Amino acid sequence: MTNSKGRSITDKTSGGPSSGGGFVDWTLRLNTIQSDKFLNLLLSMVPVIYQKNQEDRHKKANGIWQDGLSTAVQTFSNRSEQHMEYHSFSEQSFHANNGHASSSCSQKYDDYANYNYCDGRETSETTAMLQDEDISSDGDEDAIVEVTPKLPKESSGIMALQILVPFLLAGFGTVSAGMVLDIVQHWEVFRKVTEVFILVPALLGLKGNLEMTLASRLSTAVNIGKMDSPIEKWNLIIGNLALKQVQATVVGFLAAVAAIILGWIPEGKYYLDHSILLCSSSVATAFIASLLQGIIMVGVIVGSKKTGINPDNVATPIAASFGDLITLAILAWISQGLYSCLETYYYISPLVGVFFLALTPIWIIIAAKHPATRTVLHSGWEPVITAMVISSIGGLILDTTVSDPNLVGIVVYTPVINGIGGNLVAIQASRISTYLHLHSIPGELPDEPKGCYYPFRTFFGPGVNNKSAQVLLLLVIPGHLIFLYTIHLMKSGHTSLTIIFIVVYLFGAVLQVFTLLWIADWMVHHFWRKGKDPDSFSIPYLTALGDLLGTALLALSFHFLWLIGDRDGDVGD
């Protein structure tokens, strides 16, 4: 049945005595809704995201929805004057007042790529899709579906503009880290205790293991409406920061152990004082850097929410903007300081490590008190530790390459190629994760083409995630050209910019990001199908793979350049 407004009206009755034989006076209800301009204004100002497939977010308690909006506001979400698109589907509705579950069928989506989300502002990523559902007090269930023209989706240009500024900011942060590493590689601690080079990718990878995971997790919480309440928001923030400090301390210690083992295997020599220095430096660096970056990240995400910018586009690259620089500077400073105290004040190094390790129980208690992080505290160690091991293998490649005087020029470019690849794939993983949180439940995927995840499906499909993969891949070449030229202008490094070097370097960078985006498409959906949160599981693996691929491809590139005789510059001098 269709009314004068072009809405399709479906009436289901529960057979209650007050249902009036199954007929409802829709004229009065629609007129009341259409006259409520004040609620319309409020609804357009408040960032709200509705998720129809999570029934617990739609239970009615004392006439008020758990989302914080009344039933009238929920019903009024079909605003014809704003020409918003509503996708028609049937789902099971739960009546909290009588416990009656109506007949239902599985969700049918019109188009996998047509689901959008936003915070109600024009500057946000897309427009909110508020589904209609009205549950009357007498047990009637009525569904109103409005058919209106489609709202234009986020274009590739708008997406690129939102990503570009934080991407460049993060890129210049990695360039700064590369130049710092190029300087500190000549410090005494880096020359005498070469295992510190193995620590570099593992500790810089903490931004992928922890900072980007935190950014993606909080971005998803913002986009699905879990941070609308101030109490809930601060519970999430405090719990996640405490969890991150626990993970940073443990991962920092394990990274030092991995560096000691990987350094001892090829040389066959073991020094106890060097091992203590590595453990103390790694734990202290991980703790301090993680705390500073976590505070910055919370500010970025809260600010993004208030300004209407999609945090998925900006949070993860900003998480790495100064992360590499801060982490590397702290590592170099602490390592050199502890190394200078080895002979005269030998007890300082173990005391530093014991102090930061002793703080771990405090952070565990805080994180365990918050339900949002209690689960991750018990089950979120596998990806973090595995990612640390993968990054440490990349560090072993870096340590071996730097030991060759002909390939010392690799140092300044390692944080750049690793950081850029990790930033781009983290953006994609965060966007896919948010999409899945909005349009399906863990363990189930939205309707989409079946089969294996081959590259053509990742980059040339019709969905919004395919579009973002194209945009991110197109940013690789211009971004790296800017960063290469910046390094050249700063007269940093040991490598001149020749045409052959630029071509080989860009080929390795594009291959790295192409592979990472392809893997991300499969990995995020894989963890979601297994019922695991992709924000906590996929990003550590992806950024660690970015470190390993970036370091390996860069080492191969320098070997190739040396073999073909590209020595007109000062490669390896």
Swiss-Prot record:
- Lineage: superkingdom: Eukaryota
Where, per UniProt, does this protein localize? Answer: Cell membrane
Quote the Gene3D superfamilies the UniProt record gives.
SLC41 divalent cation transporters, integral membrane domain
The UniProt keyword set, sorted, is:
Cell membrane, Ion transport, Magnesium, Membrane, Phosphoprotein, Repeat, Transmembrane, Transmembrane helix, Transport
Any transmembrane segments, and where? 163-183, 196-216, 246-266, 283-303, 314-334, 348-368, 377-397, 407-427, 470-490, 499-519, 544-564
Signal peptide positions (record)? none
Q: What is this protein called?
A: Solute carrier family 41 member 2
Give the organism, scientific name. Answer: Homo sapiens
